[in-house]
Amino acid sequence: MMTENREQSPSYKRVLLKVSGEALMGDGPSGVDPVMVDMVAADIADVVASGVEVCLVVGGGNIFRGLAAAAKGMDRAQGDYAGMLATVINALMLQNALERRGMETRVMTAIQMAAIAEPYIRRRAVRHMEKGRVVIFAAGTGNPFFTTDTAAALRANEMECDALFKGTQVDGVYSADPRRNPDAERYDQLTYLEVLARDLNVMDAAAISLARENKLPIVVFNMHAPGSFGAVMRGEGLFTKIIEAD
């Protein structure tokens, strides 16, 4: 039975939001839904207005997936670089939506693209957030064979974030894909080791291990519900929290 999480609202000062490319598709099969992008921007703006420093890592699976292309014969590294470019497209869309709402925003890329974004420099990114700017990290880690989930765990640790929030198409972590298996079990809380041992397909093993090594909490929630980011920040609604064992 699904139960709504009711926990004492934690006090977050700085967080990283991982927005999957699929979360930006809306109900479409691919591409970017401008309505969905605007809704995500509105949620982020509300959280920033509450005094929380926010940075983002965006995926690119709504546009291109290097792993899928490699399965069809494309060189894996080339496919991953193409996927990095897809994340930059999503980042620019989110930047535009945030700036239309009056939010100062900076896009920083792991691969230099000086005409459209700043190069990723850790200290500069921290300074941007201290000034109240939203920082969007794009192009993953800048290296092939690493997912944007791993990039999210890496950047969250580099930015010394209090937690990593992953916005997806479902309201937490399940034992199987609930869109395909109606009997899938939903979890309110898991440990890093449980995620790895059960091979739960929420983030790749490298990302989970990186979070575990640095005791970085991960919160997985449904990005498609308006106001969901702010709600889970307050400990409300449905989500799954991944933490170290007691």
Swiss-Prot record:
It is found in: Cytoplasm. It comes from the Bacteria. One of its GO terms (molecular function) is UMP kinase activity. It holds the Pfam family AA_kinase. ATP binds at residues 18-21, 61, 65, 168-169, 174, 177. UMP binds at residues 60, 80, 141-148. Signal peptide: none annotated. Inhibited by UTP. It catalyses: UMP + ATP = UDP + ADP. GO terms for biological process: 'de novo' CTP biosynthetic process; UDP biosynthetic process. Gene3D superfamilies: Acetylglutamate kinase-like. Its EC number is 2.7.4.22. Pathway: Pyrimidine metabolism; CTP biosynthesis via de novo pathway; UDP from UMP (UMPK route): step 1/1. InterPro entries: AceGlu_kinase-like_sf, Asp/Glu/Uridylate_kinase, Uridylate_kinase, Uridylate_kinase_bac. NCBIfam families: pyrH_bact. Belongs to the UMP kinase family. HAMAP family: PyrH_B (MF_01220_B). Homohexamer. This is Uridylate kinase. It comes from Gluconobacter oxydans (strain 621H) (Gluconobacter suboxydans).
